[in-house]
């Protein structure tokens, strides 16, 4: 499996947020995500769709994914059209966001638009973070209407029931 993403370097650079509002910074991130997907086809699953929220000033305070629903839809439709999946990453729980990345709205919208390829990750860069909060994933996905998750073998998706 190859995961595409907008690098975390963009989000955490000291100067990224200088001279821009939280809304501008978040929108620029989503625009960069869309540009990456338009240009690159060398991945199977796109991760970190709303990763920017983790590094935004005051994280989720005064943030609503619905403010970005149009560009989120563009991103999801393009991924689906190109046969790409998304990752449900539980690191949001580890970092105090209280939701996975992307949050439930995006997972549900991906499913509503016809997306089927969905992997589960945890940003387990340390052994103790491997599969972090995976016990929460089935209920989250089921609440979004999703009944399957995806694993890959030789870059071929295999759907498994929750």
Short names for language-model regions:
Residues 28-36:
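Short, acidic/polar
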Residues 39-47:
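Short, structured loop/turn "capping" segments at alpha-beta junctions
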């Amino acid at each position: 499996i190859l995961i595409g993403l907008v690098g975390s370097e963009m989000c955490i650079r000291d100067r990224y947020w200088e001279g821009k509002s939280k809304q501008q910074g978040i929108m620029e991130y989503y625009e960069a995500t869309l540009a990456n997907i338009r240009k690159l086809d060398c991945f199977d699953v796109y991760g970190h769709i709303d990763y920017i929220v983790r590094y935004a000033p005051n994280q989720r305070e005064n943030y609503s994914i619905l403010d970005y629903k149009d560009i989120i839809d563009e991103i999801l439709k393009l991924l689906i059209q190109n046969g790409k999946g998304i990752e449900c990453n539980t690191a949001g729980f580890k970092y105090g966001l209280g939701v996975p990345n992307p949050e439930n709205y995006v997972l549900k919208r991906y499913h509503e638009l016809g997306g089927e390829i969905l992997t589960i990750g945890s940003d387990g860069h340390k052994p103790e973070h491997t599969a972090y909060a995976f016990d929460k994933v089935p209920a989250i996905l089921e609440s979004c209407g999703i009944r399957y998750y995806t694993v890959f073998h030789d870059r071929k998706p295999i759907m498994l029931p929750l």
